[in-house]
Amino acid sequence: MFVVGRDAFLIRPESSVEFLRRGNSPFLTGLRILSGRILSVFSPGRRRTIQAVTATIGIRGTAVYIEAATDRTYVCTCYGTVEIASRGDPTARETVRTKHHDQPRYVMASGAPQMIMGAPVVNHTDAELILLEALVGRTPPFGTAQPYRY
């Protein structure tokens, strides 16, 4: 678990993640998730991009949980807005706006009949989101009462 600027991250074991910056800028511009799982909270303002094997996710100040594998990427927009695009089919795009884990998605590898599809909420907790937001002096929009695990 760590903080970069006003963003906080919880990287699960056996994950491989690269942090992206432009030139010598101190600001994070995005992440490349090579494999594994990461829960992230991002401050509003600057746009960032998360790249996984099968998906590109445009961040607009939000919280996301991502599981990246070679055959699919799981994306839960815990709250906020993201733009999800398939890397295997650039025409497969979706804007997701949520308040509280409303629309998790799978983004499939190329060749799948449907590139972006609904998914269940899995493997992350509201308590983890509350902790990450607290590290950067914020609270999640759903509050702190009765956190639960999915």
Task: State what each model feature region is.
Residues V3-Y150:
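Flexible, surface-exposed loop/linker segments and immediately adjacent secondary-structure boundaries
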